[in-house]
């Protein structure tokens, strides 16, 4: 039996190059999962802030502040990276910075809100801007009709790593009796060390071609960056389909950010214990692996636009279903019933959320790569990063509505963001956008 036929990248050249790139996707999972999704948001609320009336808003502002910094610097950093051929240096620096500051989160004591903010802000900034530089390598790793497969397989590997992290986390919680949020500091140190370890293959083997263009007059990095960025913005009218895609990313990226940063908090509010919470996130992760299979195997054949629309429709239906569950749960609680409201619908919702998270994230990255002009990849992915980071800042309206009006209304706001993203995606002409990129 030939097992190689089950390997999606079989026959691709530069296998070491591909795996060194995938390694950084795997590194990212420790921060995405342990810090942003599973543990740190709960630790921040229960141990650091210790005030239910403001914890959601403080968390959203802390996270949003780091995203605002990333959003402001992403396009400029991308322009500099393209001009000076320093994408790899920026990528590795971001990995080292994120790993070190993540380890520092293990030092936080109860009530030390400012220390938590001062450690989390640079860690999340480095993690977020590193995602942009990592994605900008994608067009050079595969042919244009293979980027969906590479992106999807890398996301599948990252989700498999996340599943391993979940098993290790759940095992440590049960064996070492670390169920209490105040006992989670060792997990933060572990997350930082994991990030640093998987950055090493990227540092050793990922190759970046050198540009031969002359540096713009003025010479320094800031001048270079602003000149290139200004030219890109001036040419934006030629790439209107890419502009639609980046705009859509802003809105459905908000939905993905809400899931990443509020899924564990919502699950706790609906009666999940800490071990249940780990299993719930494991279910989301497994569904995410399934979600990456479609972009890996079919996106290049099905079409990037059609793939994104399918995944968006699934997410929109899921958000509306979640809002209905929240409404029925609150009505049940208001009725004074002593019978616990069933949680099985949350497991269905979790599966659909995970499917959308894996499939939409991978499909979006590949779609941007398909529409990006050659030799401007880091600039385009810098602007892509700007949209995604702004989408994270847009989680604050969700948090405000959640705190002041309730979960049902907040989830309807989430569905509205996804609907706008779907409408913008419908305006994209995939073939026209790709042709415009190749003519640049």
Predicted segments, located by residue:
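Helix-to-loop junctions at the C-terminal end of transmembrane segments
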Residues: 72-86, 290-304, 402-403
């Amino acid at each position: 039996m030939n097992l190689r036929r089950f390997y999606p990248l079989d026959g691709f050249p530069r296998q070491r190059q591909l795996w060194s790139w995938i390694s950084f996707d795997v590194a990212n999972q420790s921060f995405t999962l342990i810090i942003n999704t599973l543990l740190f948001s709960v630790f921040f609320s229960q141990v650091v802030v210790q005030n239910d009336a403001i914890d959601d808003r403080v968390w959203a502002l802390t996270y949003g502040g780091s995203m605002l910094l990333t959003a402001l610097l992403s396009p400029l950093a991308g322009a500099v990276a393209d001009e000076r051929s320093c994408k790899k240096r920026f990528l590795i620096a971001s990995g080292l910075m994120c790993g070190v500051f993540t380890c520092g989160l293990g030092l936080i004591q109860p009530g030390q809100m400012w220390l938590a903010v001062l450690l989390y802000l640079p860690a999340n900034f480095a993690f977020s801007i590193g995602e942009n530089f990592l994605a900008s390598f994608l067009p050079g790793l595969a042919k244009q009709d293979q980027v969906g497969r590479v992106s999807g397989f890398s996301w599948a590997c990252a989700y498999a790593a996340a599943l391993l992290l979940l098993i290790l986390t759940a095992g440590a919680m049960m064996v070492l009796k670390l169920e209490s949020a105040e006992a989670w500091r060792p997990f933060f140190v572990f997350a930082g060390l994991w990030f640093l370890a998987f950055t090493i293959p990227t540092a050793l083997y990922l190759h970046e071609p050198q540009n031969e263009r002359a540096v713009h007059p003025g010479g320094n990095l800031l001048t270079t960056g602003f000149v290139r960025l200004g030219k890109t913005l001036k040419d934006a009218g030629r790439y209107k389909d890419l502009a639609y895609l980046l705009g859509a990313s802003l809105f459905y990226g908000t939905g993905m950010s809400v899931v990443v940063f509020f899924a564990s908090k919502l699950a706790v509010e609906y009666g999940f214990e800490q071990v249940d919470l780990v299993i719930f996130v494991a279910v989301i992760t497994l569904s995410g692996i399934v979600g990456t299979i479609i972009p890996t195997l079919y996106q290049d054949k099905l079409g990037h636009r059609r793939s994104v629309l399918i995944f968006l429709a699934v997410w929109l239906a899921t958000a509306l279903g979640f809002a209905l569950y929240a409404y029925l749960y609150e009505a049940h609680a208001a009725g004074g019933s002593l019978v616990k409201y069933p949680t099985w619908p949350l497991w269905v919702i979790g599966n659909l959320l995970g499917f959308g998270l894996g499939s939409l994230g991978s499909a979006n990255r590949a779609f941007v790569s398909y529409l990006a002009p050659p030799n401007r990849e880091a600039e385009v992915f810098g602007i892509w990063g700007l949209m995604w980071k702004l989408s994270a800042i847009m989680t604050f309206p969700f948090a405000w509505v959640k705190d002041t009006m309730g979960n049902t209304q907040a989830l309807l706001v989430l569905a509205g963001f996804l609907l706008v993203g779907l409408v913008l995606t419908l305006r994209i002409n995939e073939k026209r956008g790709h042709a415009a990129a190749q003519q640049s």
